[in-house]
Amino acid sequence: MRNVILHLCYLGTAYHGWQVQKTEVTVARTLELAAEQVVGHPVHMSGCGRTDAGVHARHYIANFRTDARVPAERLPYALNTHLPEDIVVMEAWDTHEGFNAIGSCVRKEYTYQIYNSKIRDPFYVNRAWFYPRQLDETVLARAAEQFVGTHDFAAVRSV
């Protein structure tokens, strides 16, 4: 059985996070349903981590196993025809049997955006925190210094 890696990006506004839930629409389940239509059998998607409800992912890695003969380079096109516009498979490739998106993840990067203006911009809705008051850049710079360097976030990670 092949082990296939998918490089995804998605807008999480309409989803209750990555992880499959019994009664909620999730990114993983939406992707599984699309993959099942393409490969012709049930699949289980493993993701590189959980995202919360409403969270977006610009570069997200998932993997699944299949014995379908669809070439990996054709999978993005095939999957994207069965996915909503807010989930896109950017690329796919075959990998070794031992790869698992969550267990093989070596790095995560989070971006938090502040839209600082007196007037809201609809293009930033669900993509940035709207803050209409004056920002104290000195305080922000001082806070940002705490993140410079290498840190052990083991106490707050989920993997």
Protein language model regions, located:
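Structured-RNA-binding interfaces characteristic of tRNA pseudouridine synthases
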Residues: M1-V159
